[in-house]
Amino acid sequence: MANRIKKGDQVVVNAGKDKGKQGEVVRVDGDRVVVANVNIVKRHTKPNPQAGVAGGVVEREASIHISNVNVLNPASGKGERVGFKVLEDGRKLRVFRSSGEALDA
């Protein structure tokens, strides 16, 4: 099944502690997404000299459930729901549900 949200999409968080924040999708892992500079958590890491990792407290982005983000519509400046439209040649095209405007070129 095709995902409604893809890597590189600009999204808006619509639930949780970071509600209202915008960012770019860095990674999609099944039903979870990692958004740049959103849901920052502190991880306590052990030093690993072989990998060149210094130990300590590291801040990084944690994943968010895909249902808690909406794709940013550049026309309206708001996060909106995305659906699919099947073209005559059988390809699926992502479209905004509110306007029917195509998301992909």
From Swiss-Prot:
<dbReference type="GO" id="GO:0005840">
    <property type="term" value="C:ribosome"/>
</dbReference>
<keyword id="KW-0699">rRNA-binding</keyword>
<dbReference type="GO" id="GO:0019843">
    <property type="term" value="F:rRNA binding"/>
</dbReference>
<comment type="subunit">
    <text>Part of the 50S ribosomal subunit.</text>
</comment>
<dbReference type="Pfam" id="PF17136">
    <property type="entry name" value="ribosomal_L24"/>
</dbReference>
<dbReference type="GO" id="GO:0003735">
    <property type="term" value="F:structural constituent of ribosome"/>
</dbReference>
<dbReference type="Pfam" id="PF00467">
    <property type="entry name" value="KOW"/>
</dbReference>
<keyword id="KW-0687">Ribonucleoprotein</keyword>
<dbReference type="InterPro" id="IPR014722">
    <property type="entry name" value="Rib_uL2_dom2"/>
</dbReference>
<keyword id="KW-0689">Ribosomal protein</keyword>
<comment type="function">
    <text>One of the proteins that surrounds the polypeptide exit tunnel on the outside of the subunit.</text>
</comment>
<dbReference type="InterPro" id="IPR041988">
    <property type="entry name" value="Ribosomal_uL24_KOW"/>
</dbReference>
<dbReference type="InterPro" id="IPR003256">
    <property type="entry name" value="Ribosomal_uL24"/>
</dbReference>
<comment type="function">
    <text>One of two assembly initiator proteins, it binds directly to the 5'-end of the 23S rRNA, where it nucleates assembly of the 50S subunit.</text>
</comment>
<dbReference type="InterPro" id="IPR008991">
    <property type="entry name" value="Translation_prot_SH3-like_sf"/>
</dbReference>
<dbReference type="GO" id="GO:0006412">
    <property type="term" value="P:translation"/>
</dbReference>
<protein>
    <recommendedName>
        <fullName>Large ribosomal subunit protein uL24</fullName>
    </recommendedName>
</protein>
<dbReference type="InterPro" id="IPR005824">
    <property type="entry name" value="KOW"/>
</dbReference>
<dbReference type="GO" id="GO:1990904">
    <property type="term" value="C:ribonucleoprotein complex"/>
</dbReference>
<keyword id="KW-0694">RNA-binding</keyword>
<comment type="similarity">
    <text>Belongs to the universal ribosomal protein uL24 family.</text>
</comment>
